[in-house]
Amino acid sequence: MECEACIGMGKDCNSWMKTCAAHEDTCVTFQTEVIAAPVSLTVIFKACGVSDTCHLDYMETTLHDKVKVRIKRSCCTGEDCPLPPFPGLGFQVNRPNRLHCPACIGLFSKECTEHLVSCRASENQCLTVTGKEFGLFFRALSYKGCATESLCALLKKRFWDGLEDIEVDFKCTPALPPPSLASDV
């Protein structure tokens, strides 16, 4: 099976046809939006994938009250479908859901200084990611924040195993309830 493969800024990228590994049975397009209010950046990623993750089509993670990442995926399974449809992230209002997680990012470090962040919409997991190797981008990476169960499920499938030079560990735990107010009684 062959799929379109590329990564680029915006809603399209200069692709080539890639022969998929034996266990890969679907073509996948990821549209990722990184929002650091008031700015947003869209990245498109096309690759081979596995069809048992296609139901995980929408994911979110929040790093800060004004910084979040939204991911929408589309799959196309079968020999006659090398070009999956564009996922199309729509506008969405994501209100806080009263859950919290520790959050931080370290772009060149396996450690970072945590702060508490409010989870939004369907984010009910606390995500911790540690990258020991991250391709051409980073030699170390740490990330903590709120996440959707779908993002945790996709990470559990280790979808990046086919990518070279990426070594990432992650952990998801249930998000924390609102901090209780201490009383002076």
UniProtKB/Swiss-Prot annotation:
Highest taxon, organism lineage: Eukaryota
Signal peptide: none
Gene3D superfamilies linked to this entry: CD59 (2.10.60.10)
SUPFAM superfamilies: Snake toxin-like
Record CDD domains: TFP_LU_ECD_PINLYP_rpt2, TFP_LU_ECD_PLIGB
Keywords, comma-separated and alphabetical: Disulfide bond, Phospholipase A2 inhibitor, Secreted
Compartments reported by the entry: Secreted
Disulfide linkage: C3-C27, C6-C13, C20-C48, C54-C75, C76-C81, C101-C126, C119-C146, C152-C172
GO cellular component: extracellular region
InterPro entries per the UniProt record, alphabetical: CNF-like_PLA2_Inhibitor (IPR050918), LY6_UPA_recep-like (IPR016054), PLipase_A2-inh_b-type (IPR016338), PLipase_A2_inh_N (IPR004126), Snake_toxin-like_sf (IPR045860)
Gene Ontology MF terms: phospholipase A2 inhibitor activity
Pfam family, one: UPAR_LY6
Entry keyword annotation includes Nucleotide-binding: no
Key word Kinase present: no
Tissue distribution of the protein: Expressed by the liver.
Role summary: Inhibits the enzymatic activity of phospholipase A2.
Family affiliation: Belongs to the CNF-like-inhibitor family.
Complex formation: Heterodimer with phospholipase A2 inhibitor 31 kDa.
Protein name: Phospholipase A2 inhibitor 25 kDa subunit
Organism: Naja kaouthia
